[in-house]
């Protein structure tokens, strides 16, 4: 999803993600945050396989430790070190608005840089309205909450789950229980009542649909 959004932003600028030389980097909270790090690792694998023409100009990544002010400072440091960078991926809801604010401070917009990542619609709408980015994503928090409540009630009712089980959640669909290792390399999973259930869908926001969401 992150790479797809980056590609869409590049194409909006007339850059061919498959054939043009593209420079990019990652800016998020820190390498020890399981979900964010797993997204970065998965994204790198996609880039390596499908976009060998992309160059990561900061393989050690940029980290702002979920600090809003630091996210702006680090964001400005990224742009100072790589003023012609094509893509900045912010797989963290604090890093993304900070990077966007840094871009505005330095005179960038969606026509000369592609910044994308994960954050709530309300946190980013202003930057999108300003023309600083083309798209960003997350998930529908209502669906997330409904899944969490249903699974909690399902197990509280005495049901036992294990990796490989498929749970049918009304109004959402069939969801498979995955091993913890699916999001955290080397993580153990207990035999029962343990594992990961992923949201069946994620959401991509643009100027066209961002006002359909209020969270």
Locations of the language-model features?
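A residue-level marker of the well-folded mature domains of exported/periplasmic proteins
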Residues: 1-215
